[in-house]
From Swiss-Prot:
GO terms for cellular component: nucleus; plastid. Residues 136-144 are annotated as: LID. CMP binds at N105. Its EC number is 2.7.4.14. The gene is UMK3. It holds the Pfam family ADK. Optimum pH is 6.5. Residues 44-73 are annotated as: NMP. This is UMP-CMP kinase 3. It catalyses: CMP + ATP = CDP + ADP; dCMP + ATP = dCDP + ADP; UMP + ATP = UDP + ADP.
Amino acid sequence: MGSVDAANGSGKKPTVIFVLGGPGSGKGTQCAYIVEHYGYTHLSAGDLLRAEIKSGSENGTMIQNMIKEGKIVPSEVTIKLLQKAIQENGNDKFLIDGFPRNEENRAAFEKVTEIEPKFVLFFDCPEEEMEKRLLGRNQGREDDNIETIRKRFKVFLESSLPVIHYYEAKGKVRKINAAKPIEAVFEEVKAIFSPEAEKVEA
């Protein structure tokens, strides 16, 4: 349960926090704040995949083709990119955003990296609120129309909720009410990340 994993030859294991929340829950903004205030490195699974595609590598081309065909990129591919990013970064504490997307991702990540997250930060936000935000911001993303948005919610609920339940059973979920204004949400985040809160949890 709170056991420290044996280090895999590289000394201390990095601290990993999974950040989950539906589309429009505001987790990206909060991640930026956490990075700024607490010195974490923010790793977005989606950004890593996009960067790999851009690099024009063989791996990138394969990822691009899978996405084009509407297939899900295999867990191993995403995990390898995350692992590489963790190893190449001098930091030892990471926010992993938008991953694990499902139970299979979660199990594969723990098996491959032998890292269990310290906790899972879950930005809980009602669908109507997320919908309103996504339609309001329309950052030129063509996937921000109402049908697609609802599809994204459905996928999030069906695939990510089992992950949240799994970690809830281990007492590792820190749920944030993400329907509030940005500053109020960050106050809740701060209560979790401040050293006092960590001492209480320890």
